[in-house]
Every structure is written in C-alpha cells, then in structure tokens.
Amino acid sequence: MGKLLLWVGLVLVLKHHNGAAHKLVCYFANWAFSRPGPASILPRDLDPFLCTHLVFAFASMNDSQIVAKDARDESIFYPEFNQLKERNEKLKTLLSIGGWNFGTSRFTTMLSTFTNREKFIRSAIGLLRTHGFDGLDLFFLYPGLRGSPRRDRWNFLFLLEELLLAFRREAQLTMRPRLLLSAAVSADPHVIQKAYDVRLLGRLLDFINVLSYDLHGSWEKVTGHNSPLFSLSDDPKSSAYTMNYWRKLGAPPEKLLMGFPTYGRTFRLLKASKNELGAEAVGPASPGKYTKQAGFLAYYEVCSFVQRAKKRWIDHQYVPYAYRGKEWVGYDDDISFSYKAFFIKKEHFGGAMVWTLDLDDVRGTFCGTGPFPLVYMLNDLLLKAEVSSTLSPGFGLSTTVNSSRTCPESLAVTKDLTTDLGILPLGGEAVATETHGRSDNMTVTPGGGLVAPTRPTLSFGKLTVAPEGKTESPGEKAMTPVGHPSVTPGDMSVPPVPIQTGDRITPPRRQAVAPEKMTLPSGKRSD
C-alpha cells in the first residue's frame, strides 16, 4: 500500500505542470508481423501520437550500401510506417541499420575505406528520401568488439562525421530539413570504454539511445532484474548508473535517452522456495506463448504470467518481479516506468527510448488496461507533464551509488580489460529472421592524435532523390536503394573536413576505467 501511495504521489507531482520538451523514441521491429495470432503487429497498428520519433528496425547492408531487409519492407512496411505521419505531422521517422543478429563484419568492411563509406552515405540518403524517412539510426553492436577490429572505433567516428556533413549539404541543395542522425549504444561501462569516444559522439549525433536493459538475465546464476532504475550496494548495474556514466564521460545530457524495455527477463529457479532477488537459478524459464524465446517475455505475456503468480517489489531499485513455482521474471510495469520518467526529468536527460512498441500490449487485449499501457504512461508523463521541484518522499536519487555527482569519478582504474566481455543480445532480437593494429588511411601523430590527411572529397554526382512527401514503389530491384529522377545534385560534394585541435578524433591517453564490483557474465546467452 505504501508503494502504491508513493506512486500516486509521484504521478501527481509529475503532472503538476503542463508542457515539457522531451523525446520519446520508439522502435518497431520488422519481424513483429511474424508472431502468431493477436501478437502479430504491422506498422499500421501503431499509434502515431504516442512517440515523438518512430524507428524502423532493421535495414540491412549489401556491398557497403544500405538496403531493405526484404522486398516486403519496401513494398508494404516502409509505406505503412511513414504514412503514420499523415495522421501526425509532428512525428519523425528513422530507419535503423544493424542489430545483434546483423553482426559486425559488414560494418567493418563498409567503414574500412573512404570509398566504402561514401557508397554507404549515398545509398542512405537515397533510401531515406525515397521512402520518406526523416533520419538514420546506427545500431552497431559494437565498434571494436564482437569481431570488429579496434580501428572501427575511429572509423565509426569518421562515418558519423561524414554522414553529418553529407546530410547538411543535401539539405541545403534540396531545401529540405536535414536528415537526423542517431545511434544505439551500450550500457556496459566496459563496452563503452572500448567502443566509443563519448564526447565526439555527443557532438556528432542528434540523440543517443542508451540500451539500459538486459543488465541481468538467464545467462547468470542468480536472479536479477532486467532493467533496475537504481543500483544496489553490491551491484552497480542500473539505468541510473549507466545514464550518469555517459554524462560524466562528456555526453550532453539533453541528447541522452534512457532505454525502457517493454519485456521481462526470466529465470528458472533452483528451488521454488528460494524465490527472492539473488536466488539461485539454473537457466531460462519457459518460452512465451507468442515470442517463443526462452528467458524472455513480452509485456503482454508478462500480464498473463502475473495473473497466476506472486508479485513483489524491489524497494531500492523501483521495479517489480513475479514468480510462480520455479519460474521467475523481472519486468517493468506502469509504476516502474513512472519512477523512471521521474528520474529522467529530475536529472535533466533528453527523454526515453522504448524497445519496442510491438512488445507492449498494442491492442489492449492482454492486460486489460487499454492499448499501449506502458508507452502511454511515458507519453503522459514525459510529453504532457513537467516535473515540479519537489521530490517525492523516499525516492533514492541522493544515495551514493546512484548520485550523478559521484559516478563515475570514483570508479576504480583497471589496466586491462578482457576481450570476452560476455556481451549479450538485446531483448527479443533472437526471434528475428535474420539471414545473415592500425588503419591504412590514418596517421598517428606524435601526440597520439589520429588523423586522416588524405581523406578525399565526398561526392554525390549521381544521387537521385524522390520528391518531398512522395513515397515511391520499390521497382524491380527491391533489395537495392531506389533512386527516382527528381532532384539531381550534379555537383553535390562535401569538402574535406579539417580536424581542429580539441575536436579531432584522438585515441584516449588515460587508463580505462571500470566500476567497482562490476561482475560481467562469463559468456554469451545460450538462446
């Protein structure tokens, strides 16, 4: 009862004032249609007024060019997805490329030379404009890891720099709004250290989607929550910790979007009588009826599970879990989403990212609380309300482990990080039907700077773009970017980019840092 009263007070505090400028970025998975029965979701089933930005996941890549994953995307799903903007003219749509199943090899090949990056950029502009997308989202998991060479960390930054310049130039020539540029990034400090130059990402991207979930799961030997808001004294993994880590490393807080999972992670308990947080587990619980993935339940499957289960609340992490027999699930609900929305507002972050819309109760048929109950709560609290200056009693923002003023400056320094970080796939993507030293163009300066003195001019001599507001049919070659005569910038070129002192892409000279007591999984998830 105390938790419920505190939650009601929190919602009232959040809704005390009207008007707020936050982003609510929501992914839609292009394999959602393949789920059975009422769980099958198409782009036309989405509510165009819930999110400020919708992101279509995922596109693919062929010969260093972005392409639709299959003909169905170009002929049916892209048009349906972008037609949502006809109902809400303020909505922005992005196309995401990558994902866990995509791997890293095609990214590495594309990033390896300026010529390949130029091909990718030209194809991206053509595909985005042809189908009416407003931007590109890069879901590269991860530069310099999972088989990606270390130089990809720097080549990825070169790509972002070149994309941004090309997007600006294309906007000038076509008199259209500039295409947006975003990226999905890890929540793991060890991955962050190896994969990203945080300050440069913050300068080059319009917003940064932090994957602050899958922090615990059935790959571990004890139960833990998928996406706790706050850390425990013996477990620093949490959404708050991750967001403050990115901010302390130099990312602009207004560009950081915290990840909100519309799914739970499950465990099979060793003993049914031992069912608390941290109880011994022996693997994943049974697959869900619709998602059919061991260790994973969509929110609409969680609703069915908890009807016959015992529910508990983790006081210091502000998230629920439930257990039934030997099955245990850590998940989010509207109450935990409310606390997380409160955290975003109090800490002045840019907003929320949802993975994914199609894992929420889209039609309201499973949970009995109306369509999109989780995302609707975020919409209501982030987009329609402004937080007051008074904290609700007992809300743990001031604890040492969660304070934005102590993390991560107090982290221990490690001299070496193992290559096997136990990196894990993001929620639900395993059900996707995917089929799929030193760089030769760089010079290391005496001061440690990394520059590319011979980077050629980025040219778009044959780029063709569809008329504004028009979605073209895919034509015969649906797996390749489509160009249609309309605007042909024959002299569309971007001059070489001088890398200024203080802004150049520079390898770090400091030792890597890692959080104290951070325990990483020993290996990848078995499912």
UniProtKB/Swiss-Prot annotation:
Predominant location: cytoplasm
Subcellular location: Cytoplasmic vesicle, Secretory vesicle
Disulphide bond pairs: C26-C51
Molecular function GO terms recorded: chitin binding; chitinase activity
Domain called GH18: residue spans: 22-385
UniProt keyword list: Cytoplasmic vesicle, Disulfide bond, Fertilization, Glycoprotein, Signal
Amino acids binding chitin: A71, R72, G98, G99, W100, N101, Y142, L211, S212, Y213, D214, W355
Domain of life: Eukaryota
Cross-referenced Pfam families: Glyco_hydro_18 (PF00704)
A GO BP annotation: carbohydrate metabolic process
Glycosylation sites (chain numbering): N62, N402, N441
Region called Disordered, residue ranges: 433-527
A GO term from the CC aspect: transport vesicle
Function: Binds to oocyte zona pellucida in vivo. May play a role in the fertilization process and/or early embryonic development.
Name the record gives this protein: Oviduct-specific glycoprotein
Organism in which the protein naturally occurs: Sus scrofa (Pig)
This protein's encoding gene: OVGP1
